[in-house]
């Protein structure tokens, strides 16, 4: 199969009156969404957007962003999705790197070298008949999303129509589909996790309740009253929701809490079991079009810390020095599947280094147990090497989070004259606790060389728009000490 019918157009034909998107009190059917997208196409065509061009999108979650993303696929342009939290300089660099022909935005932004189109101004301007793709070629690029740049400059990950299709199919085979499914979308759509929900929305014909920005109070209420069956979260969001739930429970129709961004502490999972909240832990990245592994809720306590097994059409193995290692041996996580990117835009060297014989070398460290369950230890770039010993920040963070007075924790390496590196901890308190008490608590639960040499208190930890911990900012704080 090399082509498919235009996804949204086909969905509007099959189920025109079914609700596609809910935002606050607004409801839009698939046919209404299609009509909105055609209108956006006609306005974008007038300003010169054509097939094969790359168009930057700098917008917040909302109906406008949804219609722009679909409109670019309708005309055959590639959407370069930009993170709204980046600085102007970072955004200009990414647009230059991606060779975009213009920027479409809902924000105030100026750029000397490329046209900047305000969405509102474009929609108030003239229309021109658009050439709409009736079919999508699965090999063609649909989106470019930049990696966070944990090592060096960010790289533009090219994701094809085929990658997005395979990701949605793999997720449905994993989680199943129900007629009444509604996915609450609170992740930014400029991240692959948020974008993937737009793909599932039109492929499954599934209703999405879109939250323009993260609001724990609204989300908690929506889970109780809006018929939500699935939500994607990270540990911080899950903690926020459990705090609001208190002694209560969510409706029995709520069937899946899809947890990404790293393993959750066991006490958190035990609370979810007590309250009947099915947590599916996942592992994925931009390069895999969202999740590539999932741990079923059936195993959430018996396989604590595991990200599960690969999706049906995907493969995973652990390598060290180019050799596949046996169970429990630590090494680099290497993955393969139709949802995996073919490479980075204008980065041939990085593509060759990362993707070898179809296998993507993730840069993450982990191991498989005897049953093939994946355990992610850490980013290779986050590894702390102290006196020749490997220390995984995630392990120390798990210990810190098990203390009742610790709400959030982040660990990074700091330079040490004797050991090369030693761990340093950053903590957000949920009650009264001293640095000495934290370090003593760690001494009781960790090998001596893993105990943080310093614990600093912050009002909040630095996180990205998906609420993932930004270790690089913690490393900067360490350097400033």
Swiss-Prot record:
Which InterPro entries does the record match to this protein? AMP-bd_C, AMP-bd_C_sf, AMP-binding_CS, AMP-dep_synth/lig_dom, ANL_N_sf, ATP-dep_AMP-bd_enzyme, MenE
Main EC class the enzyme belongs to: ligase
Highest taxon of the source? Bacteria
Q: What is its EC number?
A: 6.2.1.26
One molecular function GO term is: ATP binding
Which controlled-vocabulary keywords does the entry list? ATP-binding, Ligase, Menaquinone biosynthesis, Nucleotide-binding
Q: Does the keyword Ribonucleoprotein apply?
A: no
Gene Ontology biological-process entries:
menaquinone biosynthetic process
The record, for CDD domains, names: OSB_CoA_lg
Looking up PANTHER family in the UniProt record yields: LONG-CHAIN-FATTY-ACID--COA LIGASE, NONRIBOSOMAL PEPTIDE SYNTHASE PES1 (EUROFUNG)-RELATED
Role description: Converts 2-succinylbenzoate (OSB) to 2-succinylbenzoyl-CoA (OSB-CoA).
Family to which this protein belongs: Belongs to the ATP-dependent AMP-binding enzyme family. MenE subfamily.
User: What name appears for this protein in its UniProt entry?
Assistant: 2-succinylbenzoate--CoA ligase
Give the gene name.
menE
